[in-house]
């Protein structure tokens, strides 16, 4: 009998913002509060980096003073209460604090086990930008979608 250290089974494919393993994740609920700025592309879409404001709400990206606390989780339903493809200010959202998630790497291809970075103004995950501590690429995208990757994060 083979010993296993982790019984979380990886899923074969998914969409950005979906949890990629069926156990071993820490997810918390928060209220989203932000001002959408189209020039910054700070859409609160699944797989964006979020920060914790002093009032206990979260917002995509980072202002530089608040702690980054996780990755915005989405699922296969229409994400916003108002039927948009992104979350709106006032929506209750789930944030992955630790675990595995499918994400998009904007602006280039990912390298296996590379550090994950993000863009402060939008919260997009990238291979350049601000460093995300304890965030690594676990699986690189397939030929048909090279920007879709599996990420491991731990913001605890």
What does each model-identified segment do?
Residues 1-156:
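Surface-exposed, low-hydrophobicity beta-strand/loop segments enriched in small/polar/acidic residues
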